């Protein structure tokens, strides 16, 4: 569904990929990334995040945690990644990118928690329950620091992809925060969900999910309990044109992924500031029957 958009909005990239393939410099069955455009897209996202007071972490899994991709993103000022699993953390770490957020969507396995803390020291570590919070805090204590813990929360009516369900009950967030503050090596830092924004096929627009309202209510409950500096992590279908709305809803963190290479569903519907900058290269192997 992106081919027409790619050819119209970034034709020189398509032509360059074809030329390099014809010169046998890029094989068939390859993904090709326009690193110059990635850097430009990342710069747009970073600028809009800064304008709205949002911390920004780059999602890199969609392009295989490519080190060249990571370096282009860092060149635009986005210095930290969100690692949905240890593979992401290792890949971005090797590329020289610090891990800003670890453990969301995949929880860090108990046997890998110590290595995650010692090697990556993520700014934030998401946990879905008290057991995982204890493991993260214990690992951080062994590594000699206090880990900022984000709590994945949920409420009735929230929307999750299959296999992504779970988290602390949003109604219990104040008590959860108190418990996490009691962990050696850990401290409660804030709340998260996924997805906070989602493309609506009927209206062909990106809309807030019920999850974003859940985050807002939980943040209000924490503020009413006297807590300040609450981090609100709100990923999902992120483009620069949506950041102002996220900030107005109370978000403090955003995590663009497909937006960095201009391939969210909204990029198909509208010409957004980010241009498409990734393609799959193949070739016609032979003709048969005319």
Model-derived features: where do they sit?
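Flexible, glycine- and charge-enriched loops at secondary-structure boundaries
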Residues: 31, 35, 126, 166, ...
């Amino acid at each position: 569904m992106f081919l027409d958009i790619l050819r119209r909005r970034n034709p020189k990239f398509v032509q360059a990929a074809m030329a390099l393939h014809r010169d046998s410099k890029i094989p068939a069955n390859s993904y090709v990334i326009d690193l110059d455009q990635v850097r430009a897209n990342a710069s747009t996202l970073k600028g809009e995040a800064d304008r709205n007071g949002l911390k920004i972490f780059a999602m890199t899994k969609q392009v295989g945690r490519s080190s060249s991709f990571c370096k282009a993103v860092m060149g635009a000022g986005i210095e930290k990644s969100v690692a949905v699993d240890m593979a992401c953390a290792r890949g971005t770490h090797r590329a020289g990118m610090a891990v800003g957020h670890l453990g969301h969507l995949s929880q860090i396995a108990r046997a890998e928690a110590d290595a995650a803390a010692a090697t990556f020291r993520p700014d934030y570590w998401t946990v879905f329950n008290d057991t995982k919070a204890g493991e993260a805090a214990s690992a951080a204590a062994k590594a000699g620091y206090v880990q900022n813990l984000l709590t994945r929360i949920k409420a009735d009516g929230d929307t999750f992809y299959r296999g992504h369900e779970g988290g602390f009950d949003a109604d219990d967030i104040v008590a959860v925060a108190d418990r996490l503050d009691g962990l050696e090596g850990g401290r409660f830092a804030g709340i998260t969900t996924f997805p906070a924004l989602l493309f609506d096929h009927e209206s062909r627009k990106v809309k807030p999910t019920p999850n974003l309202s859940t985050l807002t209510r939980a943040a209000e409950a924490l503020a009413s309990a006297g807590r300040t500096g609450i981090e609100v992590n709100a990923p999902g279908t992120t483009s620069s044109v949506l950041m102002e709305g996220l900030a107005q809803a109370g978000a403090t963190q955003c995590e663009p992924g497909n937006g960095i290479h201009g391939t969210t569903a909204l990029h198909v519907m509208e010409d957004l500031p980010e241009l498409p900058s990734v393609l799959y290269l193949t070739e016609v192997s032979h003709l048969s029957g005319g």
